[in-house]
Design a protein with these regions (language model features):
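Conserved ABC ATPase "signature" region
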Residues: 96, 100, 107-125
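ABC ATPase "signature
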Residues: 213-214
Length: 240
């Protein structure tokens, strides 16, 4: 569902992403790990079409994000690390607004919105202004809006920022359930325990280059370490 081929991106003299190639099939939860400035967020922004690569190609499903951006974005959802929400709308108004952007005409839209608000424990805030909601409540609302059009691919930059333990468990269970149903999820995180807990495969990026890829046992082989993911990560990304 996601195919990245020979992707490169510079910011002036700094090469943020170096010749990145990666394929993520349908029904996989893939975690991107890396230190600050490694190229994770830059890669996600290129996948969404927010940044244009210097060279290389990106396909979301059957669609090239550069030549067919509308078609690619129609089957994609994106949760950034610093999301923007319309603070003068209520959650219900916001979700109907997002549904309109995707031209959703499903007859059960209102019932779907209400069920989603209950699932994410937001039914009590359905008529409050978004600007009055806590950070965690806003994050949960963002997840509802991202899934509202039933995308085939979800890109998430730091999925658990500012969430309490209850919300974290809810999001982890939701992501695994979506993957079980065939959705493809790529997420970046600094939380190694999260990657170890929920990822089908893990990619470690450093200096813009993919330096390790696979399941935990495969990463252990590649790194020459039988330790934890933290041990592997620190060994591979430490400056010599």
């Amino acid at each position: 569902m996601i195919t990245i081929t020979n992707l490169n991106k510079h910011f002036g003299a700094v090469q943020a992403v170096r010749d990145l190639s990666l394929s993520i099939p349908a029904g996989e939860l893939f975690c991107f790990l890396g230190p600050n400035g490694a190229g994770k967020t830059t890669t996600i922004k290129m996948l969404t079409g927010l940044l244009r690569p210097d060279s290389g190609t990106i396909k979301i499903g059957d669609f090239n994000i550069q030549s067919h951006p509308v078609e690619a974005k129609r089957i994609m959802g994106y949760i950034p690390d610093m999301p923007f929400l319309y603070e003068k709308l209520t959650p219900v108004e916001f979700l109907k607004f997002v549904a309109g952007l995707y031209n959703l005409n499903r007859p059960d839209l209102n019932a779907h919105i209400e069920a989603s608000l209950r699932q994410f424990d937001l039914q009590g805030a359905r008529n409050a202004l978004i600007g009055e909601l806590s950070h965690g409540m806003r994050q949960r609302l963002l997840y509802i809006s991202t899934f509202i059009h039933d995308p085939k691919v979800i890109l998430i930059d730091e999925p658990l920022i500012g969430l309490d333990p209850h919300s974290i468990r809810m999001i982890k269970d939701l992501l695994r359930a979506k993957v079980k149903d065939g959705m493809t999820i790529l997420l970046t995180t600094h939380i190694l325990a999260l990657a170890e807990d929920i990822a089908d495969r893990i990619g470690i990026i450093s200096g813009g280059k993919l330096i390790a890829l696979g399941k935990l046992n495969e990463l252990q082989t590649q790194s020459g370490s039988n330790g934890t993911l933290e041990d592997i990560f620190l060994k591979l990304t430490s400056t010599p």
